[in-house]
């Protein structure tokens, strides 16, 4: 067998159908970032297997240009590969000088890309047909699907292996779960309460790594999974997958960015279009229809009230929160809108909110609401706070924010509010500079825990 025909079997079988088309180097963000080193190491093994150097000296000796490329490849593989190396490889393998023969490396590389690519040929664009197919799946089948989805997303460190049809199915599953659950979910401790994430997927993974991936820990998220960050799809999909797999241990509330007239302006719509453009017109509305059905409030142990935004003067009892409307138009002035938009502030009474939506409320309003509802603490998100958490109204309300170094322009830490089975409250703080974790427990004299024991 000559050197020219000495090719890996997997490549040899595909030569006629795959080569000599231009080599489409992957362009997904994950491959250009975290997956770069792994991918280039695979190519390096192919180089060795295909005896690349011999080909350059023998059958492929066609000038100084190829020899220079060979040296450049060696420099790439001998060093630490980076995003620029991927760009250079893409440029090399699309070079006209390398298209005139079935070189084993190029064929094997093309086959690798073809085998690793995600096929979206099975997408059913018509919503009714999709829903009809998904409705046939059992709850057990859906949980198995969600578990596989989680493993795929985590193993690939991103969406490189996620099919569009699987995203449609996950949305369908979670919409069904949210619809069945009440507008105010009532749960017990222990639970870890997380604030805004805003598309910061690496930080979400750090939160799980520190506190335990589900189901090792129970979680309650306060909303704002998307917008302003770089990995909105990864964040919302991982959270939805955990929700589908552990519907009673992983709770998700709706934030003001889970609203179509907000997330169409602040990044989520653009990301869906840029990364799933062919199916954007179907996928983006599906996301928002599902978000419309998310619960708005949670009550932990009957004593800790949680929501994304804050309070409303329309709240007269816990039954008002149990009966919140879903879906609703968030542009309206209503109780549901206040739950997602209102803010605590150093004001007296209920005043107009500078955001242009909902209201602000003062310390007295917080204390009176706690007495009215017979609760000990209000936990909410919605605002960046420097230390990741910040108390208000004599520790009757706390703001929790879980996106450190927010938008890469703030120096804030992130925090998680930990509630024990006995409703004792403590906080884990993730520092942005080195992702150090500190645990702050409320002291016996001035703690939330002491308030809850009254």
From Swiss-Prot:
Cofactor note: Binds 2 manganese ions per subunit.
Chain positions recorded as Mn(2+) 2 binding sites: 224, 256, 308, 382
Amino acids binding Mn(2+) 1: 196, 198, 224
PROSITE patterns in alphabetical order: SER_THR_PHOSPHATASE (PS00125)
Active site, per annotation: 257 (proton donor)
InterPro entries listed in its UniProt record: Calcineurin-like_PHP_ApaH (IPR004843), Metallo-depent_PP-like (IPR029052), PP1_catalytic_subunit (IPR050341), Ser/Thr-sp_prot-phosphatase (IPR006186)
Cofactors, names only: Mn(2+)
Reactions it catalyzes: O-phospho-L-seryl-[protein] + H2O = L-seryl-[protein] + phosphate; O-phospho-L-threonyl-[protein] + H2O = L-threonyl-[protein] + phosphate
Bridged cysteine pairs (disulfide): none
Cellular component terms per the entry's GO annotation: cytoplasm; nucleus
Family, per entry: Belongs to the PPP phosphatase family. PP-1 subfamily.
Name under which the protein is recorded: Serine/threonine-protein phosphatase C23G10.1
Lineage of producing organism: Eukaryota, Metazoa, Ecdysozoa, Nematoda, Chromadorea
